[in-house]
Structures are given as structure tokens and as C-alpha cells.
Amino acid sequence: MGAEALSNRTNWQMGARISGDAGERTFAAQVAPYLGAEYVVQHRPPKLKIYSEEKWIKLDTRITNTVTGLSLYIENKEGNNGGNAHERVYKFLSPALKRVVRETFNTVENPFFLVFSGRTFQGQKYKDEINLLCEGENYAIMTSDYENIQEVANQIMEIV
């Protein structure tokens, strides 16, 4: 594809970014009312500086239990047109990354909770992959209209 064709094609990444940002905000707003008064939900918490040379990871939401002082970080992947956005969350399954975040940022034992939302993740292929690769981890696949938000909030309160 030539330079002109490339510059004139649809920028699918921008659409995906808008959809992803909306999904992050939606989850934080949807879960907050179902958590107890002792929970603080922070959308776009500070970056976690864990690598050398001021490199960091950035998660979508932090939920803190003000009684225990412990936090849980949420990474939300919103998908509405297929694709592989969900594959980028698998780094959060790394035992070493979990250990560093837990030791540095006052979190629960498993500091990450992965959320998959949007039309894409209603498909059986995606559900099967996520259920297999995230087995034993903190995660939820949101139903199309967040009908399972109470269940997910309960799951989060059991963790943190």
C-alpha cells in the first residue's frame, strides 16, 4: 500500500481508542455503586513506576479498601469489532510483575483484576480463550449490558 493510500485509509486505531476509553470509564462508574462505603474507586490512577529509567505500567482503575489500606488494580479491555486487544492483558498474569507490584504498591496478593467488556467478548471463541488462559486469576467477562456487575463487585470485595 502506497503512502497516499495509507494516509487516506480509515484510522481504526482511533475508533478502538475511543471505544476502549469509554469501556474503562463505564466499568469504574458501573462498579462503584455496588461496592461498600469502605471502597474508593479511582479511574486512571497514577502510573506504577516499576521498570528502570522511569518506565511504568498504567492501569485503568484502582479500587482501595480504606479499612485494610490494600488496593486492587483493574485492567479493562473493551472490544466491539473483534481483534486482539485482550491479548495485551496477559502480561498481568506474570508472577514476577505481580510480585513487584504487590511489594511496591500495597496491594492484595494478586494485584490485578482483568475485565473484558464489549460485543467482542460475548463471542464463544473469546470466552473460551479467556476462561482457559485466565483460569485461577482475577477476571470477569462483562455481559452486554453489565447485568453481572453486582456479581463482579462481590468478587472484587472478596479479593480486597
Please give the residue ranges for each predicted region.
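Non-catalytic C-terminal interaction segments of nucleic acid-processing enzymes
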Residues: 127-160
